[in-house]
Curated annotation (Swiss-Prot):
Keywords: Carbohydrate metabolism, Glycogen biosynthesis, Glycogen metabolism, Glycosyltransferase, Transferase
Family of this protein: Belongs to the glycosyl hydrolase 13 family. GlgB subfamily.
Subunit structure: Monomer.
NCBIfam families assigned to the protein according to its UniProt record, in alphabetical order: branching_enzym, PRK05402.1, PRK12313.1
Cellular component aspect of the GO annotation: cytosol
Protein name (database record): 1,4-alpha-glucan branching enzyme GlgB
SUPFAM superfamilies assigned to the protein according to its UniProt record, in alphabetical order: (Trans)glycosidases, E set domains, Glycosyl hydrolase domain
HAMAP family documented for this protein: GlgB
Pathway: Glycan biosynthesis; glycogen biosynthesis
PANTHER family membership: 1,4-ALPHA-GLUCAN-BRANCHING ENZYME (PTHR43651:SF3)
Protein purpose: Catalyzes the formation of the alpha-1,6-glucosidic linkages in glycogen by scission of a 1,4-alpha-linked oligosaccharide from growing alpha-1,4-glucan chains and the subsequent attachment of the oligosaccharide to the alpha-1,6 position.
Species this protein is from: Trichormus variabilis (strain ATCC 29413 / PCC 7937) (Anabaena variabilis)
């Protein structure tokens, strides 16, 4: 038997993937032999029939011998120093020279990194965990690090080792982070982690911090460099940093990239360098089509949104997800933009182009739950690592998903850093946090006995609330001027109040009450609306309790609810008039705005995630006119500060009359911040026009009709006020003057006093 410096049981721990620190065995080690200081090099090389240690600087080779196992090699070299060695291996007829991963002993993660992560406060942990192309001791390669504290062994799998978990076993640190630098591989490598628990079960997992994944249904992570893109949005970011978004116009076009528009042909998309993108088929229901890439969407979607006049695009979740039918809300790759539409750099290009066209980007973010897919976060290291072990806290049975354990520091850090990551690396301008209520209440969609109370016996998830406060506090600290929007459907207090007041720290909250009230109201026969005037007026009773965003989202056009136009009563003309009336009132009402794709041209059918929108409708004049209506409405909204600068201040809104339920008419004033400018809004919610409808106004003069939702160019009957009206010296509604208006059927008027014309008429 050849001489060896290693015991059989130590070799077996390597061979059987049972060692938490293979660096103790493998690599180079100084030893004393026969009174001399020598070096021993050990390597476990499955599939190799022979191996040598190569010293390139000395141009020497040393044959290695096998010990205790046919593929465990050892070599003793009589030298006082040993560095920069390589291993030459023979596999079949092929020989290969490469650097030994176990020669790079110094960890990239510092003790301070690990300390911050363990206490949940490493805000840039994504720069440490995951896969990072780097250089160590003059050798390029990829550094891998993954948190799996309860695993017995973790290995890196990839094309570079033929997906053999024996070849690149990782080292476990004191905090449960496993790491390994693999030399001579680079960007574009596919990889996973092979995780073995103490029962011997093996799990193949995608990288929780992976920056890119394969297109579904494949699940490998891909090494990606996020620092190679050259951004051109410095001016946008600088302006954002010094702007209060709550005093700005915010009109959001909510879009699902996978169903907005498909490429008609499955031909691959061309990249700027002449290469082609991988083809990702959009749907089995539409086999001849493929998804547009991020770059193609930049050239199609951005001009479309810009033409319509929206200020922001909101993307349904673009983090990697395995199932198209989840719409992106069941995420497995929190740090990876979905590869359905291209690479991380392609998504950077999309955001950059949005900014260069003065369009902000909001991304839906899903920190409330995650799916059970085997390659994802579920049961990650053979234990309930990211989720609660008790299903009464750790599972949403209604959705078939798992709930994050917000009380665990590392899990909280994973999510907090993820929110920051999208702003840092992709320059996004806001997040909309999905299903906040499901996070805040322990009994959400759970029957009695299916949930556990908090330490005070209540149903509030205190850890989740603290987590949301931490996210929002850090977001606005690092990235002033961005948006954090809550989809919160209950009356949890102070959702959009700052954290220093005890609030959750969002700066906007979807107004779900307004949405339900208005959709119920507009679905009624107009004759019955007189009995439900409260649906229109109630929102102003609580409007100043939160910073509200009025949203008519994707949730309102699926699951048998019909699209917006299909909810409206009457014939086609009345349906379209109702749609115009609803959205004109929405844009005049205090609050920021969000509407889902397809509403702008009156799609009749529900949203179908498997197909693109019904673009052929734009061949027909009524749908062209509706699109024109939204273009002009956005233009007015953005140009008239009275409609947005005081959305969240009481002085920004005054009712003129909200009690005319007999005619189903409301009228009010919107005021501009720091000026005396205001607009007058009058809404007629029935098809009955009124040729002499009088309302009180605060100032004498000529009121220009800025907007009429019944204009002929929008498909209306063209009833109006011939461009404007002079006031009468006739007090009404506690105002000293009044206007005698013609109210169009199912119409909204927005008027503004023309001070120049008024001054000329008065001779001043």
């Amino acid at each position: 038997m050849p001489m060896t410096t290693i015991a059989p049981e130590q070799v077996n721990r390597i061979v059987w993937n049972q060692h938490h620190d293979p660096f103790e065995i493998l690599g180079s080690h100084p030893i004393e032999q026969n009174g001399k200081n020598v070096w021993v090099v050990r390597a476990y090389l499955p599939n190799a029939s022979a191996a040598w240690v190569v010293l390139p600087e000395q141009r020497q080779e040393y044959a290695m011998q096998t010990v205790h196992d046919p593929h465990f090699f050892e070599c003793i070299i009589e030298t006082s120093e040993l560095s920069n060695y390589q291993l030459k291996t023979k596999e079949g007829e092929h020989e290969r020279v490469s650097y030994d991963p176990y020669a790079f002993r110094s960890p990239r993660l510092t003790d301070f990194d690990l300390h911050l992560f363990a206490e949940g406060n490493h805000h840039r942990i994504y720069e440490k965990l995951g896969a990072h192309f780097t250089e160590v001791d003059g050798v390029t390669g990829v550094y891998f690090a993954v948190w799996a504290p309860n695993a017995r062994n973790v290995s890196v799998l990839g094309d570079f080792n033929l997906w053999d978990g024996r070849k690149h076993q990782m080292r476990k640190g004191a905090t449960g982070v496993w790491e390994l630098f693999i030399p001579e591989i680079g960007v574009g490598e596919h990889y996973k982690y092979e995780i073995k628990n103490f029962a011997g079960h093996i799990y193949e997992k995608s990288d929780p911090f992976g920056f890119q994944q394969e297109p579904r249904p494949k699940t490998a992570s891909i090494v990606s460099n996020l620092n190679s893109y050259n951004w051109s949005d410095e001016n946008w970011l600088e302006q954002r940093r010094h702007t209060d978004p709550l005093t700005q116009p915010i009109s959001v076009y909510e879009v699902h990239l996978g169903s907005w528009l498909h490429a008609a042909s499955a031909e691959p998309a061309k990249l700027p360098n002449g290469e082609t993108e991988p083809v990702v088929i959009a749907s089995e229901l539409n086999p001849g089509a493929r998804f547009l890439t991020y770059r193609e969407l930049a050239s199609r979607l951005i001009p479309y949104v810009k033409e319509l006049g929206y200020t922001h695009i909101e993307l349904l979740p673009i983090a990697e997800h395995p199932f198209d039918g989840s719409w992106g809300y069941q995420v497995t790759g929190y740090y990876a933009p979905t590869s359905r539409f291209g690479t991380p750099e392609d998504f950077m290009y999309f955001v950059d182009q949005c900014h260069q066209n003065n369009i902000g980007v909001i991304v839906d973010w899903v920190p409330g739950h995650f799916p059970k897919d085997g390659h994802g976060l579920a049961f990650f290291d053979g234990t309930h690592l990211y989720e609660h072990a008790d299903s009464r806290k750790g599972e949403h049975k209604e959705w078939g998903t798992l709930v994050f354990n917000y009380s665990r520091n590392e899990v909280r850090n994973f999510l907090v850093a993820n929110a920051l990551f999208w702003f840092d690396k992709y320059h996004i301008d806001g997040i909309r946090v999905d299903a906040v209520a499901s996070m805040l209440y322990l009994d959400y969609c759970r029957k009695e006995g299916e949930w556990l109370p908090n330490q005070y016996g209540g149903r509030e998830n205190l850890e989740a609330a603290d987590f949301l406060r931490q996210v929002n506090h850090l977001l606005f600290s690092y990235f002033p001027g961005v948006l954090s929007i809550a989809e919160e459907s209950t009356d949890w207090p102070m959702v959009s109040w700052p954290t220093y007041t005890g609030g959750l720290g969002f700066n906007l909250k979807w107004n779900m009450g307004w949405m339900h009230d208005m959709l119920d109201y507009f679905s009624m026969d107009p004759w019955f609306r007189q009995f439900h005037q409260n649906n229109v007026t109630f929102s102003m009773w609580y409007n100043h309790s939160e910073n509200f965003m009025l949203a008519l989202s994707h949730d309102e056009v699926v699951h048998g609810k019909s699209n917006i136009i299909g909810k409206m009563p009457g014939d086609k003309w009345q349906k379209l008039a109702n749609v115009r009336c609803l959205f004109a009132y929405m844009f005049a009402h205090p609050g920021k705005k969000t509407m889902f794709m397809s509403m702008e041209f009156g799609q009749w059918s529900e949203w179908n995630v498997w197909a693109d929108l019904e673009w052929p409708l734009l061949q027909f004049e009524p749908h062209q006119q509706l699109k024109k209506f939204f273009t002009e409405l956005n233009k007015l909204y953005r140009s008239e500060p009275a409609l947005y600068t005081l959305d969240f201040a009481r002085e920004g809104f005054d009712w003129i009359d909200c009690s005319d339920n007999r005619h189903s008419v409301v009228s009010f004033i919107r005021r501009e911040k720091d000026t005396e400018n205001f607009v007058v809004v009058v809404c007629n919610f029935t098809p009955q026009p009124h040729s002499h409808y009088r309302i009180g106004v605060p100032e004498k003069g000529f009121y220009t009709e800025l907007f009429n939702s019944d204009a002929r160019q929008y498909g209306g009957s063209n009833m109006g006020n011939l461009g404007g009206k002079w006031t009468d010296d006739w007090s009404m509604h506690s105002r000293p003057y009044s206007l005698d208006l013609c109210l169009p059927p199912l119409g909204v008027l927005i008027l503004k006093m023309d001070k120049e014309k008024t001054a000329k008429a008065s001779g001043s």
